[in-house]
Amino acid sequence: MKISILTLFPEMFSIFDHSIIGRARENNIVDLETLNIRDYTLNKHKKVDDYPYGGGAGMVMAPQPIVDTIRDAKLSNKGKVVFLGPRGKTFNQEIAKELSKEEGLIFLCGHYEGIDERVYKHIDMEISLGDFVLTGGEMAAIPVIDCILRLIPGVLGKEESFMEESFYNGLLEYPQYTRPEEFEGDKVPEILLSGHHENIRKWRRLKSLEVTKKIRPDLYKKITLTKEDIKILKNKNNK
């Protein structure tokens, strides 16, 4: 997948030089580039914003540098243009799954009081992280891009790595443990030490159901229990 990030602060995305995403880039699984919107302005002072018509607080990002940056990005990336803004759908794992199927994506990061309304005709999709305000679109783009790229085959190494994570299958993830076997009186559940993979799988499914029901009952109400889920819950209640 090719990711193009249109931003005034390309240095903020250096986080993608490291860890899992960094390795995916080194292995050519992911192609990620940043385009500095300021490089495309025709203003001799390199300005990319101006006062809003009609008055009001703050500055508005001008259309010319944004649209020219989008057009340049599209020369090598035919993906959807995604804007991080307050009008958009609230981002979740389902949206991440759909976007992970694209061959490319172009992310536009706004700043200041927002973007000129005339830019919206060049935008295919708007995404919001929620009903709160951030300093700029960059801070929203980072978790969105990370979430999407984790779903690209080969990025995590094993498909099971993300299939068992919270939200992928509609549930929160089961509890995780590592060494030592006992810490300050708390012991690792014996079943995880048993080596019986089928029993461990069922235990993890049970705990995932229990944790979701307790912490996120709203999510639990949306899931459809399988025959195995019903059996696992019944066996637990009979003990």
UniProtKB/Swiss-Prot annotation:
Pfam families: tRNA_m1G_MT. S-adenosyl-L-methionine binds at residues 110, 129-134. The keyword Nucleotide-binding does not apply. It catalyses: guanosine(37) in tRNA + S-adenosyl-L-methionine = N(1)-methylguanosine(37) in tRNA + S-adenosyl-L-homocysteine + H(+). Keywords: Cytoplasm, Methyltransferase, S-adenosyl-L-methionine, Transferase, tRNA processing. One of its GO terms (cellular component) is cytosol. The keyword Cell cycle does not apply. SUPFAM superfamilies: alpha/beta knot. InterPro entries: Alpha/beta_knot_MTases, tRNA_m1G_MeTrfase_C_sf, tRNA_m1G_MeTrfase_TrmD, tRNA_m1G_MTases_N, tRNA_MeTrfase_TRMD/TRM10. It comes from the Bacteria. Its EC number is 2.1.1.228. Homodimer. PANTHER family: TRNA (GUANINE-N(1)-)-METHYLTRANSFERASE (PTHR46417:SF1). Specifically methylates guanosine-37 in various tRNAs. This is tRNA (guanine-N(1)-)-methyltransferase. The lineage of its organism: Bacteria, Bacillati, Bacillota, Clostridia, Eubacteriales. The gene is trmD.
